[in-house]
Structures are given as structure tokens and as C-alpha cells.
């Protein structure tokens, strides 16, 4: 049967990407339907119960700046908070929260159910409905066809998922949930380049069987941070510590003994690549022979359960091996395993088959987001879902698509890396991937994106009002500091009266220090958020200005637009290899072409000369801007 309503946007999958996609489209006023195998698992944390970290925390802040869900849910669920790289510069400092997975899922569910224009329906999607090369809806296991103007697929690890514990495997999307086999088969029949990836998870352990006295205690940071710009520490639940222990040579000996029963090493998983930056414990042991131990973080999964997530020992080894090696670890000698660790192998599609809006090139109005595009991690998935939701809504309204540049957002770096270079191993975000990371700090994500989001329609008036108030407060406090004169006798080494704004350029002096020198009462200080902005601006102003100048120069040199589509075999002098890569990627400007693997300065010069000679200047409407990406 046909479902009686026509939707603007259908989102397939209720994980982190799906939730952000559905909520973004709904915030923009689209009648949106979220389809999920199980309503009870919306927002479920399938692996590590944590949000944020290096690069990942930046993505969470950007999601929040665009009025997304993840930061707000984490603020309601975070039970252990830390600021990573606190002693380093502001650009690489990152927030990380250990989340109560029960509270997190409940918070996400509440935000989804509160969202206007969003409907949820429980069914397994079995295929997509096409009219020629345009998607018009999806089919389901209940023999119900759902029709929509756009469709976003956020299937996570469920496409053709196989779960391995040793050499034995069973079909599943994650432990306890079925794989989307029929949908995977239907998608493989379409003109998408299909590959396989593998990821894994560690055995879970009963906290009551752990001797924490033999481990190092790791407390959270004080004062407690928040993820959302609208957040408040009063939303946080009770805080608890994590603990640290290590593997040892006995652990490693057992892993080597069973290595021929690890599916990757036995050749059972042949064509799937695992995550480079989150290797299994067997990979660590086999790749790093000289290391006699590896760190393990014992992370509580919830305030209301006894399960512990031992971060650092994800595995595909048989359960017998898991029992043996866990019992060699200090503090885990009597550990009781509640769930075995496992590896999961699943389908993904080459992201080079996507436009920057995350619409597929092969099927009009069909968008992919999350692990289906070759990424790993909740944050990377959520960020893609948000972008796909925005662009699906823009398509519904017949508006041009949007995506951020590399100098605007880590989301821009993520999308550009995927589409320009593709990936064969699970892609995760790091600050090191961003060449303009001084501009892409956690603290200024709202300044980079909130106003743009408001213009696009995905940021609500309440957030925009709060953002405007913050920026007004920053401007007012900055002006006051420019007028505040500090007498020379108030500070050792000061030879003349100096304005506070000048003193702030010194690395050892911050806003609170100059206000104290001026005898300003503490209750008259600006908010912590405002003080942070002023301190960073004062300390890094020269570096930030230099990076803006570098960006402007780069944009000028590489702003040459390229026609899409174009036959690059016409460009005389290009190597066959580069012509083939350009033909596949179809870069929209010289900047994107420059990042294609194997591109040379000589080849870029050829392209620049060729297109300046053979193409007409683009109109202003075609050049794009802060809120314009490519035509959908």
C-alpha cells in the first residue's frame, strides 16, 4: 500500500546522522519522516559511550552552532567531562564527555519527539523508489511505500552487516539488531561504487567484578564545561570518575596465541579495512611489537547500570581468548564479561560519488550521510546528517545547496576530504586535518556558523537572539578594556600608564588580571564566555589575521571556477592518470582540483591556463558565497 501522506524529506535510520538530518529538515519547516527499525534505539550509542575529543569536539560545537541535537543531549547525559589539550593553544583544545548511554538516548528521543514537523515510524526500509534517475520514496518490509521529494539514507553499519566473534559470524547491524540486507542488495544494484569496512568494540565488564584499587583514578575537570552554547552545567547529571589500567606481556602472549582466529588475520575478512586510529587490541599487539603495554580506560556506561566499557581493547578474537587476556590485566583478574567484544563488517559507498551537498551524483534527490560515506564516529556521522538535512530541505524549497568551506568549519574539511580524496579506511576527524585550524576553534563555532544557519532557516530565533546578545556583550567589554587605563605603579615593570587592551597582548596577563589591577569588583566582571573570547582575540590576533590573509590569497589564486561536467581528456598535456581522476571527481573549482591525490603544480597551471582561455566569467549568482554552495 501507499502511505497516505507525501513527505518533503524521508530519513532512513535513527542513529546520530539520521537524528540530525531529520531534525535539521524539520527545523527548516519540511514535513519530515524518520524511518527506523526500532523506535526504542533512536540515538543509541552503539560503541563507546562518549562524545567529543580532538577534532570531534569541534564538530559537536559546529553541530550546536547550527542548532543541532548532539551537544544538547550530551549536556543532559555527560557524567565525566574533560578539556583535552588544555595546556596547548586554543585551536586544538577539545571538549570530551563520557556520557550515560541511557540518559543520552532518552535525551535524543525527547528532542526528536519535541521537534515540530517531524514524524517517526517503525519499519525496516527494504529499497528506494525511483522515477528514472530520481528518487521518489522508499519501500519497506511492511509492504508500505512511503513517498517523498527527497530521501536521506543514514544506515550506519547496518548495510550487509556481519558480526564476528572469532571465526564465527552472524548477520547483524550491531549486536542485538538485524542487518539491512534487502536495502543493501538494492543499493548495490544502483550505480554506486560499493566497498566494505570493518570496525569493532570491546567486551563489556561488570563493574562489581573489577578491583579499582589496583588502577589509577581519573577525575573529570573542574569547572565542568558544557557542549552547547545554550547549555548550563546544572543540566549535567552526577559526575563519576574513570579508571586507567594497562595490558602487559602476558596479555600480548595470549593475543598472539589466538591471532589465527582473528578474522582479519585469518583472511575471513578480506576486503574490509579497519580504523587506523582506533585499532583493535590484536592490531596493536601485532603492529607495535616493541610495546610491552597498552593503556586501557575503564569508562562507566551509565549511572544506573554496572557495565564498564574498557576503551582500548576492542577485539574480534573468540570469546575464549577474550576471557583469558582480560584476566591478565591488572584489576581485571576476576572480571566478569557481560557482553563479548566483536568486529562488524559492512557496506559503504565511495564518497566521491557525492556532491558537496551530500546528494548522490547518480540519483537525484537522494542523499547519503554517516558511515555509509566511509566515516567512523558519532560526531562525524552527526555532522554529515545535519548537512544532508539542510540540503534536502533546500532542495524541497528549490534553493541552492550549501556547504561550508575548509576555512569555515571542520565540517567543511570533512566533506572536502571525503569527496575530493575518497577513503578506503574509516575516516575520523583530527585537528591536524585542518590547515586553517586557528580559525576553527571550539569557542568560535557559533561566530562562524550561527548567522549562516539562521539565513538558511535551520537556526531558530531563540539561538540567534542568544548569539546576538553574546556578541554585543563581547563588543561592549572589548570597548571598555580599550578605555580602561592601568596606572604604571599597579604592575611591576610597567613604565607608563597603559590601556588594559594593550596589556592583554602579554601572554601572562588575562582579562581577570587587568580587571583586578583596575580594582573592578569581581561581580562586575563579564561572563566567562565573554572573557574567553576577549582573551583569545588578544593573544592570537596577529596569528589569526595572518591566517585570514593566507585564506584570502589562496581563494584568489584558486578561485577559478571549473565547468561541471567536463571532459578532462580535452586538456592537452594532462597525464592520463590525472585526467582520469579529474574526470571522476569533477571538481567545481581549482581549489578542489588542487587537493586531488597526485595533483601537481604543473597540472594545476595547465588547468588554469586552459580554462581562462576557454571559458567565460561566471555570473555573481554562480560564484556562490557564505550561504551558497553548488546548484542542487
UniProtKB/Swiss-Prot annotation:
Cofactor list: FAD
Annotated residues for binding of FAD: 13-18
PROSITE patterns, alphabetized: GIDA_1 (PS01280), GIDA_2 (PS01281)
GO cellular component terms given for this protein: cytosol
Coiled-coil residue spans: none
Record's subcellular location: Cytoplasm
InterPro entries: FAD/NAD-bd_sf, GIDA_C_N, MnmG, MnmG-rel, MnmG-rel_CS, MnmG_C, MnmG_C_subdom, MnmG_C_subdom_sf
GO molecular function: flavin adenine dinucleotide binding
Stored Pfam families: GIDA, GIDA_C_1st, SAM_GIDA_C
Keyword match Cytoplasm: yes
Major site of localization recorded for this protein: cytoplasm
SMART domains with a match to the protein in the record: GIDA_assoc_3
SUPFAM superfamilies: FAD/NAD(P)-binding domain
Alphabetical keyword list: Cytoplasm, FAD, Flavoprotein, NAD, tRNA processing
Residues that bind NAD(+): 274-288
UniProt-listed GO biological process terms: tRNA methylation; tRNA wobble uridine modification
Keyword NAD among record annotations: yes
Alphabetical list of HAMAP family matching this protein: MnmG_GidA (MF_00129)
Subunit architecture: Homodimer. Heterotetramer of two MnmE and two MnmG subunits.
Similarity remark: Belongs to the MnmG family.
Role this protein plays: NAD-binding protein involved in the addition of a carboxymethylaminomethyl (cmnm) group at the wobble position (U34) of certain tRNAs, forming tRNA-cmnm(5)s(2)U34.
Protein name listed in UniProt: tRNA uridine 5-carboxymethylaminomethyl modification enzyme MnmG
Gene: mnmG
